[in-house]
């Protein structure tokens, strides 16, 4: 297959990176404000003069996978002629190991022709504070003391555990590419490869990639593998597209109709899969699909065990248990003993719990407003106001209607609504 096209066509310069002008400007402005960089580069790209840009000790590039976070850093290092020291934080996890690798890289002399060194910590959100002893603390320490530019990348840096990194970094958000921008890149690659690609075929690849340029390029290379020089819509239909977004009805249908355990488990790999929503739907659809009492009981037994895992995950933040919960909730529910032959069409009902929550949303919002008012004015916690004070007010309101009127004026809602809340 040769060199991966993701690497072959990786942008070599800032100007070749599409749709990330704001991110490029912020990154260049930070480099030029704190470190030595070519004058022509700074004159072209460094347009931001804000205090927080110059004072940040590092840059944290944020955004979904495949939009060019790592590519931006590679292009920056090439533009300013810095040697790039790249580490994948999810591979080198312990603090001791991180310090050793970075320290060794910084102590070694730069190769001939480089003006300095730039450190890239890729995928810092791959660190798990509980498991990766000292990894996050080591990165923070390096950022605080390093005399060289440090850039980090993360898909989601807004997890509370990354607060220490965010506090000392300039967070730069990269945008997801539009379908048209992905198509333009794919079109250029087809031309460079001497391949004749139908426009609709490229649009189909771009649409299914959901703005992930890396995924789109990998898909294009897969479709044109084996020396093929043409690509049509029929080719894509024949081979199959990237996993589409699935509705919950489609998720349930795939799980219940799965012939093997792994086939049901694979549903969780779909980008649209929401395990919390799935669990609510599964609880109500099991008796619809499995009419036999013993079969339904077996499915509910797997769901109850999965619920035990989920409860522990939420209480203890032990997310490493999630795969086991999903195996029980998906494969376990699908592969029950005496599984019946399913009809061509199954009518899955919307979970009543979600319907009730939707219907009561406004009432719950008003009740929370009442709780907030009581907590602030009585100088008590919201939980105490919710569990005790509301019931006291309810008893008082039954004896004295003026209590309802006073609360109505304070909250700005009519007296009937206040009475209903109590």
From Swiss-Prot:
GO terms for molecular function: ATP binding; ATP hydrolysis activity; DNA clamp loader activity. Pfam families: AAA, RCF1-5-like_lid. Keywords: ATP-binding, DNA replication, Nucleotide-binding. CDD domains: AAA (cd00009), HLD_clamp_RFC (cd18140). The keyword Secreted does not apply. One of its GO terms (biological process) is DNA replication. Gene3D superfamilies: 1.10.8.60, P-loop containing nucleotide triphosphate hydrolases (3.40.50.300). Heteromultimer composed of small subunits (RfcS) and large subunits (RfcL). This is Replication factor C large subunit.
């Amino acid at each position: 297959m040769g060199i991966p096209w993701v690497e072959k066509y990786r942008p070599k310069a800032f100007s070749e990176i599409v749709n990330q002008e704001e991110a490029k400007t912020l990154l260049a402005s930070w480099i030029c404000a704190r470190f030595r960089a070519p004058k022509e580069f700074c004159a072209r790209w460094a347009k931001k003069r804000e205090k927080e840009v110059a004072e940040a000790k590092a840059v944290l590039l944020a955004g979904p996978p495949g939009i060019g976070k790592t590519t931006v850093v590679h292009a920056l290092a090439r533009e300013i002629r810095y040697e790039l020291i790249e580490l994948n934080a999810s591979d080198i996890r312990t603090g001791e190991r991180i310090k050793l690798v970075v320290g060794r890289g910084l102590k070694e002399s730069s190769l001939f022709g480089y003006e300095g060194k730039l450190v890239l910590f890729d995928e810092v959100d791959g660190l798990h504070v509980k498991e990766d002893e000292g990894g996050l603390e080591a990165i923070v320490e390096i950022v605080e003391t390093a005399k060289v530019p440090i850039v980090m990348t993360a898909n989601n840096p807004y997890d509370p555990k990354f607060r220490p990194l965010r506090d000392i970094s300039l967070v730069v958000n990269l945008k997801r590419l539009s379908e048209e921008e992905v198509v333009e890149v794919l079109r250029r690659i087809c031309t460079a490869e001497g391949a004749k690609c139908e426009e609709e075929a490229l649009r189909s690849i771009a649409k299914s990639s959901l703005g992930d340029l890396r995924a789109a390029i990998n898909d294009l290379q897969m479709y044109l593998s084996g020396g093929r020089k043409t690509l049509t819509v029929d080719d894509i239909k024949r081979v199959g597209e990237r996993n589409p977004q699935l509705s919950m009805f489609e998720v349930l249908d795939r799980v219940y109709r799965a012939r093997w355990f792994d086939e049901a488990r694979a549903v969780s790999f779909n980008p649209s899969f929401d395990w919390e929503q799935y669990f609510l739907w599964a609880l109500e659809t099991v008796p619809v699909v499995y009419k036999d009492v013993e079969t339904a009981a077996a499915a509910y037994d797997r769901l109850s065990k999965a619920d035990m895992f989920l409860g522990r995950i939420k209480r203890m933040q032990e997310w490493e248990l999630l795969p086991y919960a999903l195996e029980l909730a998906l494969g376990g529910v699908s592969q029950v003993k005496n599984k019946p032959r399913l009809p061509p069409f199954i009518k899955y009902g919307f979970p009543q719990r979600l319907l009730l929550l939707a219907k009561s949303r406004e009432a719950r919002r008003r009740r929370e407003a009442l709780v907030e008012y009581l907590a602030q004015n009585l100088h008590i916690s919201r939980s105490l106001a919710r569990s005790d004070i509301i019931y006291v007010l309810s008893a008082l309101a039954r004896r004295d209607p003026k209590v309802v009127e006073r609360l109505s004026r304070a909250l700005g809602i009519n007296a009937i609504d206040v009475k209903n809340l109590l």
